[in-house]
């Protein structure tokens, strides 16, 4: 036991899938995206990107990155006279719970809502899923709804906030459209993935990562990596990313998925989401 305490690692070897963000090929891929206007989230995200502050903080740190990239005012002091988001001052967040259990996709969406950012959840389904299937409001996310009723997410108590976390089912072709939409729309519209690392030939379980650019010619997306002590940011095929979203979250027993996130320019303005 004494010996095991001395074991340490400096990063993992590169996974067999994907293209390293720092490679020459990556530079050309990003240049193509910039020229075709499909890397709009890139600069806002990379300007605020950082290594996650704890091993289980991929969700929380990416939440902080997202809020700061969207230029949301936290309305609370960070240090000195400055207001800024950090892992310690996210409204309604239980940081000790996140250290122990991490964060689910629904919790990520709930915390975005608590901090004034509109979002919608999409989960992958079998290709044969009927797109007109009626979603049962009584059964979806029951665990999260119970938490809300018990006031565990203190300000997420109204139906409006909960309804925005009801997931829309999506198939792979629609996922490709979502990637194109999120990368080309504008720099206040992000796509955050909650994927299973195994689908990308990486070690570990669930992970949060935004798609910062989408190369339509090669049909690949750039995933930014908050666990920089472990892996570099990489480009992956849209097929591989989608398949990694199908993996079930061991905590919720539901497929993982992604969020489309948009900053509201004006209070009450209706947001246009991906059409069904």
Give the ranges of each region predicted by the language model:
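Generic hydrophobic secondary-structure signal
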Residues: 58-70, 108, 179, 185, ...
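A short linear-motif detector with a strong N-terminal bias
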Residues: 36-38, 44-46, 98-99, 168-173, ...
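Long, acidic, intrinsically disordered low-complexity segments
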Residues: 1-23
């Amino acid at each position: 036991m004494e010996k095991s305490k001395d074991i340490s690692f400096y990063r993992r070897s590169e996974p067999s899938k994907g293209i390293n963000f720092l490679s020459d090929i990556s530079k050309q891929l990003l240049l193509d995206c910039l020229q075709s206007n499909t890397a709009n989230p890139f600069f806002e995200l990379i300007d605020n990107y950082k290594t996650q502050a704890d091993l289980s903080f991929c969700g929380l740190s990416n939440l902080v990155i997202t809020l700061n990239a969207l230029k949301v005012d936290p309305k609370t002091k960070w240090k000195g006279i400055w207001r800024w988001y950090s892992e310690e001052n996210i409204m309604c967040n239980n940081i000790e719970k996140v250290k122990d259990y991490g964060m689910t996709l629904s919790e990520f969406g709930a915390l975005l809502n608590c901090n004034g950012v509109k979002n919608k959840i999409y989960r992958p389904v079998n290709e044969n899923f009927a797109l007109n299937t009626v979603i049962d409001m009584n059964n979806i996310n029951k665990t999260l709804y119970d938490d809300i009723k018990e006031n565990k997410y203190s300000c997420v108590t109204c139906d409006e906030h909960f309804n925005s976390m009801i997931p829309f089912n999506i198939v792979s072709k629609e996922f490709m459209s979502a990637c194109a939409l999120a990368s080309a729309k504008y720099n206040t519209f992000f796509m955050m993935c909650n994927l299973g690392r195994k689908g990308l030939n990486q070690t570990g379980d669930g992970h949060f990562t935004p798609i910062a650019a989408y190369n339509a010619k090669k049909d690949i997306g750039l995933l930014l990596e908050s666990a920089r002590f472990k892996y570099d940011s990489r480009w992956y095929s849209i097929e591989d990313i989608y398949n990694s979203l199908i993996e079930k979250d061991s905590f919720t027993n539901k497929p993982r998925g992604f969020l489309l996130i948009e900053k509201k320019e004006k209070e009450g303005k209706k947001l246009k989401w991906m059409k069904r």
